[in-house]
């Protein structure tokens, strides 16, 4: 009998959470990671990557890892430039990661590294503010998004 490395009651994937009032936690699979090579308002420009070949598409989620900011891809401008929902690249080089979007969200459990309040959108599309979540806490609620407004906790990781 063959045994899988995955167990049904444990998380198999984890992703750092950048809180947003509009963007769901993305699928925890990196499409591409690199550094931007130029700056233009509301764009990600990387002359070293071919976003078409990599399969980056509208709705994918971009993390500016350097600054801890987030945006979605609204369109491809060219093979090396993406139009974004927010101006998250104002200098170079900034490290970024692109993840598959999560429009019909998977449900994630959360780990909170540093204490505070956590404002979430549950998988049932209900907003909830969890008050005074302690350091190193797991939140046993299925969530699709961690909202920026109302969240004071940090070092949050989504588990799938």
Place the predicted regions along the sequence by residue.
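Short, flexible beta-strand-to-coil junctions
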Residues: 65-66, 111-117, 148-151
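Surface-exposed interaction regions enriched in Ser/Thr/Asp/Glu
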Residues: 91-101, 147-159
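Short, surface-exposed beta-strand/strand-loop-strand elements in extracellular ectodomains
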Residues: 115-124, 155-159
């Amino acid at each position: 009998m063959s045994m899988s490395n995955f167990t049904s009651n444990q998380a198999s994937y984890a992703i750092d959470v950048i809180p947003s009032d509009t963007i769901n936690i993305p699928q925890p699979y990196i499409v591409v990671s690199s550094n931007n090579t130029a700056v233009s308002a509301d764009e990600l420009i990387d002359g070293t990557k071919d976003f078409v070949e990599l399969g980056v598409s509208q709705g994918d989620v971009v993390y500016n890892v350097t600054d801890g900011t987030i945006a979605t891809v609204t369109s491809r401008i060219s093979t090396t430039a993406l139009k974004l929902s927010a101006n998250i690249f104002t200098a170079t080089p900034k490290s970024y990661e692109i993840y598959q979007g999560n429009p019909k969200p998977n449900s994630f459990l959360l780990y909170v590294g540093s204490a505070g309040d956590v404002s979430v959108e549950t998988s049932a599309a209900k907003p909830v503010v969890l008050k005074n979540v302690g350091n190193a806490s797991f939140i046993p609620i299925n969530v699709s998004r961690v909202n920026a407004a109302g969240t004071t906790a940090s070092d949050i990781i989504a588990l799938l």
